[in-house]
């Protein structure tokens, strides 16, 4: 490479003719630049641009699908939350109804037990009063018979 540059710098243009005589260097470099630009555009940039465009479309499609899936997930979440709230309300109503029913059953059983105890107590009280009256009557007859016997003995 160094040798080539030395040769070019040491060479002299002798005489007329050649490219450098008409000063066409600048247009030639411009034509070379344009040809190289067209060649690079056809060979390198066009395939790169198509690949980039395909990748852009692929990403946009994936983003659209992802946003669609996200919106569906949000809809399902809202639907399930609403269903969960209604089920919770129904369960709460069921619990309160069951508590009311159990409370009523307990009150009924308590009333039945209270009536049974009241009846039993009344029966026992009546029975005791009857036994007391019977005992007092029998004691009264015994006392009267003893009084009669005492009088009989005293009168003798």
Curated annotation (Swiss-Prot):
One GO MF term: proton-transporting ATP synthase activity, rotational mechanism
GO cellular component, one term: proton-transporting ATP synthase complex
Location relative to the cell: Plastid, Chloroplast thylakoid membrane
Source organism superkingdom: Eukaryota
Family matches, as Pfam families: ATP-synt_B (PF00430)
Topology of the protein relative to the lipid bilayer: Single-pass membrane protein
Entry-linked InterPro entries: ATP_synth_b, ATP_synth_b/b'su_bac/chlpt, ATP_synthase_B_chain
Keywords: ATP synthesis, ATP-binding, CF(0), Chloroplast, Hydrogen ion transport, Ion transport, Membrane, Nucleotide-binding, Plastid, Thylakoid, Transmembrane, Transmembrane helix, Transport
Transmembrane spans: 24-44
UniProt function note: F(1)F(0) ATP synthase produces ATP from ADP in the presence of a proton or sodium gradient. F-type ATPases consist of two structural domains, F(1) containing the extramembraneous catalytic core and F(0) containing the membrane proton channel, linked together by a central stalk and a peripheral stalk. During catalysis, ATP synthesis in the catalytic domain of F(1) is coupled via a rotary mechanism of the central stalk subunits to proton translocation. Component of the F(0) channel, it forms part of the peripheral stalk, linking F(1) to F(0). The b'-subunit is a diverged and duplicated form of b found in plants and photosynthetic bacteria.
Miscellaneous notes: In plastids the F-type ATPase is also known as CF(1)CF(0).
Family affiliation: Belongs to the ATPase B chain family.
Subunit: F-type ATPases have 2 components, F(1) - the catalytic core - and F(0) - the membrane proton channel. F(1) has five subunits: alpha(3), beta(3), gamma(1), delta(1), epsilon(1). F(0) has four main subunits: a(1), b(1), b'(1) and c(10-14). The alpha and beta chains form an alternating ring which encloses part of the gamma chain. F(1) is attached to F(0) by a central stalk formed by the gamma and epsilon chains, while a peripheral stalk is formed by the delta, b and b' chains.
Protein name as annotated: ATP synthase subunit b', chloroplastic
Organism: Trieres chinensis (Marine centric diatom)
């Amino acid at each position: 490479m160094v040798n080539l540059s030395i040769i070019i710098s040491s060479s002299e243009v002798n005489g007329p003719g050649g490219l450098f005589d008409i000063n066409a260097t600048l247009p030639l470099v411009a034509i070379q630049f344009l040809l190289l630009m067209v060649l690079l555009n056809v060979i390198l940039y066009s395939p790169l641009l198509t690949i980039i465009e395909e990748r852009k479309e692929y990403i946009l499609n994936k983003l659209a699908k992802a946003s669609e899936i996200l919106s569906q997930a949000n809809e399902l979440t809202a639907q399930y939350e609403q269903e969960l709230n209604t089920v919770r309300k129904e369960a709460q109503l069921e619990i309160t109804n069951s508590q009311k029913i159990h409370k009523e059953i307990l009150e009924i059983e308590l009333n039945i037990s209270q009536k049974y105890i009241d009846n039993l107590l009344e029966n026992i009280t009546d029975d005791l009063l009857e036994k007391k009256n019977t005992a007092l009557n029998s004691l009264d007859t015994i006392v009267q018979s003893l009084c009669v016997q005492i009088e009989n003995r005293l009168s003798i």
